[in-house]
């Protein structure tokens, strides 16, 4: 065997062993359940009847997760429920004002006043520092929860925000 062949064989063996090591680490971490589940848009409460937004999902790490409103809603939509999801950025979240005076609270009040026979459910999924890429991603999954409407209050972060001109991604 020539010197070049031995050299290439050794490089191949080192690369194979390195890859095998990384695969072993990955399998071990998965087997022991390390990390968090980022696949689901919503997480369940302990009793499994209610859902709430998984803020860490795909977009932010645990330390960077934005502080959205924690809105619980029934997993199964009730017969007499009118369900609206609100997607948006910090303005839709109500920032910088308290949650109880944000537009979805006022909308819920007005809808309950005009439709007293309906159970009005407005779930605000707004997060800071997101844009229409996130809205699109959320909306694809929201249709499975039988919304009667999806309100999108966004646009502020399209130009200067995530994946905009001010982004480094």
Feature names for model-found ranges:
Residues 10-27:
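Hydrophobic membrane-insertion alpha-helices, especially the h-region
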Residues 90-93, 127-132, 156-160:
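Solvent-exposed loop/turn segments at secondary-structure junctions
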Residues 104-107, 118-133:
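Mobile, glycine- and charge-enriched loop segments
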Residues 32-110, 114-115:
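Membrane/wall-proximal cationic-aromatic binding patches
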Residues 35-44, 133-169:
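Interaction-surface signature
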Residues 2-11:
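Membrane-helix interfacial "entry" motifs
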Residues 83-86, 121-126, 149-153:
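Structural recognition of the beta-strand scaffold that forms the well-ordered cores
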């Amino acid at each position: 065997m020539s010197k070049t062949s031995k050299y290439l064989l050794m490089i191949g063996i080192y690369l194979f062993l390195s890859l095998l090591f990384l695969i072993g680490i990955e399998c071990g971490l998965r087997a022991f359940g390390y990390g968090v589940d980022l696949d689901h848009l919503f997480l369940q409460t302990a009793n499994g009847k209610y859902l709430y937004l998984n803020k860490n999902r795909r977009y932010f790490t645990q330390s960077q997760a934005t502080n959205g409103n924690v809105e619980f809603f029934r997993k199964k939509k009730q017969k007499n429920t009118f369900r609206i999801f609100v997607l948006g950025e910090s303005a839709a979240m109500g920032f910088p004002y308290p949650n109880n005076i944000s537009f979805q609270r006022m909308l819920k009040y007005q809808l309950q006043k005009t439709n007293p026979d309906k159970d009005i459910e407005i779930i605000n999924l707004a997060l800071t520092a997101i844009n229409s890429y996130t809205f699109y991603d959320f909306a694809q999954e929201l249709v499975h929860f039988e919304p009667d409407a999806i309100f999108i209050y966004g646009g502020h972060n399209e130009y200067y925000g995530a994946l905009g001109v001010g982004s480094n991604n």
